[in-house]
Amino acid sequence: MLHDARDRQKFFSDVQYLRDMQHKVDSEYQACLRRQEYRRDPNEKKRDQFWGQETSFERSRFSSRSSSKQSSSEEDALTEPRSSIKISAFKCDSKLPAIDQTSVKQKHKSTMTVRKAEKVDPSEPSPADQAPMVLLRKRKPNLRRFTVSPESHSPRASGDRSRQKQQWPAKVPVPRGADQVVQQEGLMCNTKLKRPNQERRNLVPSSQPMTENAPDRAKKGDPSAPSQSELHPALSQAFQGKNSPQVLSEFSGPPLTPTTVGGPRKASFRFRDEDFYSILSLNSRRESDDTEEETQSEECLWVGVRSPCSPSHHKRSRFGGTSTPQAKNKNFEENAENCRGHSSRRSEPSHGSLRISNAMEPATERPSAGQRLSQDPGLPDRESATEKDRGGSENAKKSPLSWDTKSEPRQEVGVNAENVWSDCISVEHRPGTHDSEGYWKDYLNSSQNSLDYFISGRPISPRSSVNSSYNPPASFMHSALRDDIPVDLSMSSTSVHSSDSEGNSGFHVCQPLSPIRNRTPFASAENHNYFPVNSAHEFAVREAEDTTLTSQPQGAPLYTDLLLNPQGNLSLVDSSSSSPSRMNSEGHLHVSGSLQENTPFTFFAVSHFPNQNDNGSRMAASGFTDEKETSKIKADPEKLKKLQESLLEEDSEEEGDLCRICQIAGGSPSNPLLEPCGCVGSLQFVHQECLKKWLKVKITSGADLGAVKTCEMCKQGLLVDLGDFNMIEFYQKHQQSQAQNELMNSGLYLVLLLHLYEQRFAELMRLNHNQVERERLSRNYPQPRTEENENSELGDGNEGSISQSQVV
């Protein structure tokens, strides 16, 4: 009972302890949740405050647009960078991701380098100003919203602007997917970018002549300067999502500002000056303490995060690198349908007159050695500034390594500057430690930037640069063949740019293509983009497969030699390991002047074109050899059988009859060969002594009498009389001896067990007797007896010491 009560009490105490522990853990968890909510609430309040302040500032800034336009352009050009600097300083960095925080050393280095560059020569544009790729974060209020109407640049009444202001506060979130940032309602182009927690950036190209001309135009009082400074925030809009390849270059460069050709009602909206990039470069210089460090960290993250070969890159060059979205549809109207058509996969070409480039101007300046990127000079025609800036910014965002082609101007009369080829970015070798970063960027571009109608493959060399007046650096890469991507002539591979006396620049590219899967003989890339060629020229696509007779693995690279010139001749030589013959296939695409304006060209890139005749001959040869081999195989078994029979005959003649147990031929009178069962062949004969031993072994192993009398092979009874050996008697004796052994073993076991019991019983009795004695002694003699015994022992010790002293 006592034990049960104790166990019950212990159980209850354990349960209570567990409940207490659970309650304690729950209380701690609740306290932790409350602390997190307490921390979250102030952050949300701060964020709401910042958003409210930004919204109020944006509204005040856009509401004061009419008054600011009446003021001088010099004041606007000065106040706009100052306001952007103030807002960027006012904006806190709490919303930045933790991965963008760089070390103090990197910050110090970046700020010192920028300041030194500014102190060297203030009159000359520094390399930081000349660098076209400026990484901007989406945390500046002046880069947040952008509302543009073509009517805002025309002298209209203030009522129209007030009507636009009423439409302004409606927030339009940035869509993802095919429909892009721009949503137009009538004559209004209103884009709204929410502030995401993820990392956003945009590569903004800035051109040297624009940067140099900015102060001059501001002094002259050009009324377009403030408008450009107000329009440049939309340049830096980016999409939501963190490093997503699908939104890499969805919207690059200036906003989709519709350029109308006809219609008296609709005023054409265009950038009337090229120096709106200069204000952006000035802002980047003044905010170098804040943006340069982020630029370095974001470039590192950009190189590390981007996957080289991602299948989801098929949407990254939506607007095209070297040509603009308005190359397909230049005369689109200012409504949502055409604007979305440009934003989505492809837009229907208009039937108006297409303004193809006559503005392929040679560059006025070459980039310096320390300069990372430079852009071609702006176009003299102001109406083409939108297309130019769009193409340049797209190229800068698409790839740090692009191609800067400077060719002769076209001679068409009614064409407008589209800057399809000249508005690209050239890259030179950076000295010293910057080469490694260039290699990384090259390798990155090899997986991103593409001539999108060719088949994907990895580059041979990460970098190639040829610097001359007609030999700019050209980087090529073959990307996956897709039908919804414009032609991007900036590719990464080993390329050599050559030019002849007539000005036809050609590019010779050695590019590997990996045959990942069996491709169709003719893979066409439809609706890519217009090629800047004359209407009378033709496209010739030549494909020759040159292989060797040696077999190669399936993943062998296909080296493609691409010869490309601006006159429209395209020759493709593709060597693969599919067939051992040479084959030339030519496809000519004749393009007239009217078709050139409205119909996109279809390019054929043939990378795998097997020769069926050669395959058939090879199959026939292989079938012939297979027949020969099968005939040989049929003849071989007959020879083997003959050899085996001859060997068996020789063995039987030499050795004679063998005992199946000891494998010894012949017998003796004392040990003859017997036939105990119905076995034949090599198992027919057994020696007498061998059979006796075998039967004894079977009996002693514990087999039954029936198993002993039966042959293991033929399952027949052994009909032998071994004379002195009686199998039944031996079996009975073995059984008796076995029983006796078992009995003896059991008796011995019992004796040993009884002995152990006796020892255990004696030990228990002794322990019990000792316990009884102790209890009896404890009852007779109480506890203090032990203390008295100790005292008496001490007294005896003292008496002994005294007696010893007396004896001495």
From Swiss-Prot:
GO terms for biological process: protein ubiquitination. It comes from the Eukaryota. Gene3D superfamilies: Zinc/RING finger domain, C3HC4 (zinc finger) (3.30.40.10). Residues 237-249 have a biased composition (Polar residues). Residues 33-81, 101-268, 284-415, 773-808 are annotated as: Disordered. Zn(2+) 2 binds at residues 677, 679, 711, 714. The keyword Transferase applies. Coiled coil: none annotated. Keywords: Metal-binding, Transferase, Ubl conjugation pathway, Zinc, Zinc-finger. Its EC number is 2.3.2.27. Residues 34-49, 330-349, 379-397 have a biased composition (Basic and acidic residues). InterPro entries: MARCH10_RING_CH-C4HC3, RING-CH-type_E3_ubiq-ligase, Znf_RING-CH, Znf_RING/FYVE/PHD. CDD domains: RING_CH-C4HC3_MARCH10 (cd16813). Pathway: Protein modification; protein ubiquitination. A zinc finger (RING-CH-type) spans 651-721. SUPFAM superfamilies: RING/U-box. Transmembrane segments: none annotated. E3 ubiquitin-protein ligase. E3 ubiquitin ligases accept ubiquitin from an E2 ubiquitin-conjugating enzyme in the form of a thioester and then directly transfer the ubiquitin to targeted substrates. The RING-CH-type zinc finger domain is required for E3 ligase activity. This is Probable E3 ubiquitin-protein ligase MARCHF10. It comes from Homo sapiens (Human). The gene is MARCHF10.
